[in-house]
């Protein structure tokens, strides 16, 4: 059983926590997420044009890039995380350019060497994923695909083909941090996806509070929170780890106790 499979095999939903690499003391921030009870870590790769991200994560990208964070730095952060936390699943999330600049095979091999479990590439449509996805799968890395409220029955098979680890359901069309969609809409769309795949379905975008996270955990296999955590890094700087652990615990407790 892989680390991702193990995280989603529990009787409760998995809590997935996101922060941006290179923003603040990333190692301490990641450790705080684990200490707070996160089941899966998503580590954002900073990019100059993060089109799917809202103001909070865009600002985190700017802060990280201003410090000179590179793809190699992200991989080093991942490698050091894996050494400290051998059992916690780690997913890289970002955009195609940094992932394929040196070639998909290079990136996939580096991810494998650093103990990365999965990769979410936001801006490669599944119909155009002829190189990165196969390279990741060949290296034993799960290519995790995004489904949205506009992913209809005709397109869903393309999204699911070659997807591994879990399906990331984007609960609102648009950018991260937006207002959450209605729970009944989320429930029906998650159920629709699950009728077509045995993969777990995790829901993200617009989830900010323990109450929201707990409600979604009753209808999905996982809950992803990013902007609310990233905002703490921007607001509290060196004091962010304590704040992150506190919010992560509240979110994880709500997710784990929802069923």
Curated annotation (Swiss-Prot):
GO terms for cellular component: cytosol. SUPFAM superfamilies: Ribulose-phoshate binding barrel. The keyword NADP does not apply. Pathway: Amino-acid biosynthesis; L-tryptophan biosynthesis; L-tryptophan from chorismate: step 5/5. GO terms for molecular function: tryptophan synthase activity. The active site is at residues 42, 53. CDD domains: Tryptophan_synthase_alpha. Its EC number is 4.2.1.20. The keyword Membrane does not apply. Keywords: Amino-acid biosynthesis, Aromatic amino acid biosynthesis, Lyase, Tryptophan biosynthesis. It catalyses: (1S,2R)-1-C-(indol-3-yl)glycerol 3-phosphate + L-serine = D-glyceraldehyde 3-phosphate + L-tryptophan + H2O. Tetramer of two alpha and two beta chains. HAMAP family: Trp_synth_alpha. Belongs to the TrpA family. The alpha subunit is responsible for the aldol cleavage of indoleglycerol phosphate to indole and glyceraldehyde 3-phosphate. This is Tryptophan synthase alpha chain. The gene is trpA.
């Amino acid at each position: 059983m892989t680390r991702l499979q193990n995280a989603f095999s529990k009787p409760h939903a998995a809590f997935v926590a996101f922060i941006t690499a290179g923003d603040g003391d990333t190692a301490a921030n990641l450790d705080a997420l684990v200490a707070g009870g996160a089941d899966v870590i998503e580590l954002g790769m900073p990019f100059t044009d993060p089109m799917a991200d809202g103001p909070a994560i865009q600002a985190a990208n700017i802060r990280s890039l201003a410090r000179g964070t590179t793809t190699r730095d992200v991989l080093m952060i991942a490698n050091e995380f894996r050494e400290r936390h051998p059992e916690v699943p780690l997913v890289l999330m970002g955009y195609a350019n940094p992932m394929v600049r040196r070639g998909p095979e290079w990136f996939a091999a580096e991810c494998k060497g650093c103990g990365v479990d999965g990769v979410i590439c936001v801006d490669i449509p599944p119909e155009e994923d002829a190189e990165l996805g196969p390279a990741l799968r060949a290296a034993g890395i799960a290519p995790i695909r995004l489904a949205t409220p506009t992913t209809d029955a005709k397109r869903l098979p393309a999204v699911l083909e070659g997807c591994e680890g879990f399906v990331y359901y984007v609960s609102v069309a648009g950018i991260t941090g937006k207002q959450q969609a209605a729970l009944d809409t989320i429930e029906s769309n998650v159920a629709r996806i699950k009728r077509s795949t045995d993969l777990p379905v995790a829901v993200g975008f617009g989830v900010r509070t323990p109450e929201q996270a707990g409600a979604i955990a009753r209808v999905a296999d996982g809950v992803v929170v990013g902007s609310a955590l990233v905002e703490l890094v921007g607001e509290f700087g060196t004091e962010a780890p304590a704040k992150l652990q506190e919010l992560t615990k509240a979110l994880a407790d709500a997710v784990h106790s929802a069923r």
